[in-house]
Amino acid sequence: MRTYQALVLGASGAIGSAFLRHFENDSHCSLAVGLSRQKSSHTHLQFELENEESLAHCAAALCNPSGPYGLCEFKWIIDATGALTIDNLGPEKRLEALNSKQLLRQFEVNAVGPALLMKHFFPLLLLQENACYATLSARVGSIEDNYKGGWYGYRAAKAARNMLLQTAAIEAARKRPLSVFAALQPGTVQSNLSAKFVAAQDALRPEDSVSQMMNALTHLKPTGRAQFVDYAGCEIPW
């Protein structure tokens, strides 16, 4: 098996750090880069999701032969960015709880930021070889699967993230026909995001979720469009 390079965006969160460990522990992975807003001992770059200039700077550094990692061409790019509670405000349960500031922040973090990551990091995928770009979505981002209501901003932002991925994937697949593009539902995972809503014993360990998501991703075939699946590899309706 040939060696490969992997990039994790949002590598400081529970799921992002588990993805990074997964790649670091794979002997076939010659380079595992984790980017986040937090400084760490093993990364030379950091970005701010809501600052496009910093995203562009990181992407440029990764495709620069004189950069900290040399010229990178990634087989795997995982976007693990996102948040449910933003600025100490949790999801809205009722229509009367909506306010423009909170809605805009949800879209900024869970849709606009991820879209700009696609813009700047899609070009770093391998060109004429099998590759994968996956972004963390959520089952609540499915319009068809919405039977419970609530969580207005988070649902809407994740649905927007899905649409942005689908549209970008169709364009990107014209140059990268062997690439898989996926919106991933990681399940309910032990993390700061889920801690207020579910007991730890009822949630997946991050490493277990990542192991299953990687298994699901390896079984997806290029279709020229994005695919929406859960951690078990089951298709989720858009």
Go through each PLM region and give its residues:
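Catalytic loop of short-chain dehydrogenase/reductase
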Residues: 83-87, 91-107, 127-175
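Conserved active-site helix of classical SDR/Rossmann-fold NAD(P)-dependent CH-OH oxidoreductases
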Residues: 115, 159-170, 207-214
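N-terminal Rossmann NAD(P)H-binding glycine-rich loop of SDR-like oxidoreductase domains
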Residues: 9-25
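C-terminal helical subdomain
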Residues: 179, 183, 191, 198-238
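A short helix-coil junction within the Rossmann-fold of NAD(P)-dependent oxidoreductases
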Residues: 68-70, 120-129, 175
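Rossmann-fold cofactor-recognition segment
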Residues: 37-57
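Hydrophobic structural elements of the Rossmann-like NAD(P)H-binding subdomain
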Residues: 78, 134, 181-184, 194
